[in-house]
Amino acid sequence: MSSRFLAALLCALVCRALHADPIAAGPGTFECPNGTEPITVFTYKPPTYKDGPVLVVFHGVGRNVEDYRNFAITLAERFGVIVVTPLFDKDRFPSSRYQRGGLLDPNGKTQASAAWTYAVIPKIVAHVRGLEAKPKLPYYMIGHSAGGQFLVRLAAFMPGEAVRIVAANPGSHLFPDRVQQFGYGFGGLPDELSNDDVIRRYLAAPLTIYLGTADNTPEHSFDASPAGMVQGPHRLARGRACFAAAQTLAKERGWAFNWRTVETPGIGHEAAFMFAAQEAGDALFGK
């Protein structure tokens, strides 16, 4: 998807929404147009909201989107942000289209970028900007578990305008190499999606790997496949290993490296606790 096309799309979506009412204070929902697949989005706007950014929240494999919206209320109140949490239901968005972003079709062929699930996110952001009549409203993203997997791969292929992308406790990572097959690495992808320029841009993306130090057991729909186990025995180890590999590669090549890693002590594979932790603010808004 070219930057010119994306800019035109965002402008059109913002203009369409300009005459709609702004997001109401408290919890709510809206439907975001998306061709034949409209997306239901759960929201929370603090009653004291002024002009803070948007926080797009991504649910886990359980698709419990309303819970995730509620988990993020503490972040909304603490930082004065509008929370928007899209539902990627299992029927329309199985793991190939959610955790792996729809990069490949059911036959393993690369799809056009407009068909990627990542391409839905700019539409949601544009819709919110239109509702709020703030076409330059900045946005941040955070996802836990399967939502974290979605975001690490989004960071590689379509980071958009996100100020910061926070992947919390993902079960597998996209390592910056062509040895591991996609979605564990860039192996098997065509050159235009796996060459050094792609990996260089990935390492320059504003990605935070946010880990609970007690997420160190193979539980909660853990990826115990051979490809997964290459990355480490548990989520904590995998996150640390991916960050170290990325940092080392960037240093060796002299590339920009904008990743961060943040750990919160004593928390396991629990989105509610990860979002409520003091370190969540550092993961999102720290420098």
List each model region and its residues.
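C-terminal catalytic histidine-bearing segment of alpha/beta-hydrolase fold enzymes
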Residues: 223, 243-287
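Bacterial N-terminal signal peptides
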Residues: 7-16
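Bacterial N-terminal signal peptides that target proteins for export
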Residues: 1-7
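Cap/lid segment of the alpha/beta-hydrolase catalytic domain
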Residues: 89-115, 221-222
